[in-house]
């Protein structure tokens, strides 16, 4: 199976993530205070996860296209993760594997692309600029590099506003699985201009 350098392709849009270190923020916020012990304890518990996986539904909506897929995400910090996108029939549309020495993406034709920067690769392959570094943390319900966020009445992340270059990303959380320890999101939405990305996590497995 050939290995190709990254080039522009019409591929299924991908909302994948990269692991990045988390830090305590001094944000602009409303609602529950981000310096509260409850929020600080929650962040610490999330950051202490040694392994997790989740599966669910992914949707990308813009003025020009609508795409949906099932996804499976498996992460073993600090830099090993796998993201698999499949169509409704269960066939692979796109697979991303990341390790400390690089990133490999396989498309639905079996072609492989290798590189070092997953965020750059996804932008080149799909034509979409997605904040992958921060999405890795947003999917877990922590704010990443964002300094503007709000908490709900349970001291869980409710909204995030993040500026990346000339793009403003707004993230909103619709629901959490509070039976998990720590509680983790089950539905969130990212909006940037006319782009809208929806993620629904049907289940989580954490260690």
From Swiss-Prot:
Lipid attachment site numbers (N-palmitoyl cysteine): 22
Gene3D superfamilies in the cross-refs: Lipoprotein localisation LolA/LolB/LppX (2.50.20.10)
Assigned keywords, A-Z: Cell outer membrane, Chaperone, Lipoprotein, Membrane, Palmitate, Protein transport, Signal, Transport
InterPro entries in UniProt: LolA/LolB/LppX, OM_lipoprot_LolB
Signal sequence interval, chain numbering: 1-21
Membrane topology (UniProt): Lipid-anchor
GO BP terms, alphabetized: lipoprotein localization to outer membrane; protein transport
UniProt xrefs under CDD domains: LolB (cd16326)
Location (main, coarse): membrane
Subunit structure, as described in the record: Monomer.
NCBIfam families according to UniProt: lolB
HAMAP family cross-referenced by the UniProt entry: LolB (MF_00233)
Name by which UniProt lists this protein: Outer-membrane lipoprotein LolB
Organism: Pectobacterium carotovorum subsp. carotovorum (strain PC1)
Taxon lineage: Bacteria, Pseudomonadati, Pseudomonadota, Gammaproteobacteria, Enterobacterales
């Amino acid at each position: 199976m050939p290995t190709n350098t990254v080039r522009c392709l019409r591929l299924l849009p991908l909302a994948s993530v990269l692991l990045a270190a988390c830090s305590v923020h001094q944000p602009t916020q409303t609602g529950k205070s981000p310096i509260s012990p409850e929020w600080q304890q929650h962040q610490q518990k999330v950051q202490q996860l040694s392994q997790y996986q989740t599966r669910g539904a992914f949707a990308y909506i813009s003025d020009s296209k609508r795409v949906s897929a099932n996804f499976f995400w498996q992460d073993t910090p600090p830099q090993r993760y796998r993201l698999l996108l499949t169509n409704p029939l269960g066939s692979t549309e796109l697979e991303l594997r990341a390790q400390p020495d690089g990133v490999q993406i396989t498309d639905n034709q079996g072609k492989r692309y290798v590189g070092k920067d997953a965020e750059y690769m996804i932008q080149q392959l799909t034509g979409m600029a997605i904040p992958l570094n921060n999405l890795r943390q947003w999917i877990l319900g922590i704010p990443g590099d964002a300094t503007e966020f709000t908490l709900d009445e349970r001291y869980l992340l409710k909204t995030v506003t993040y500026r990346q270059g000339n793009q403003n990303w707004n993230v909103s959380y619709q629901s959490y699985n509070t039976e998990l320890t720590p509680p983790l999101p089950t539905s969130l939405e990212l909006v940037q201009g006319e782009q809208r990305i929806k993620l629904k996590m049907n289940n989580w497995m954490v260690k």
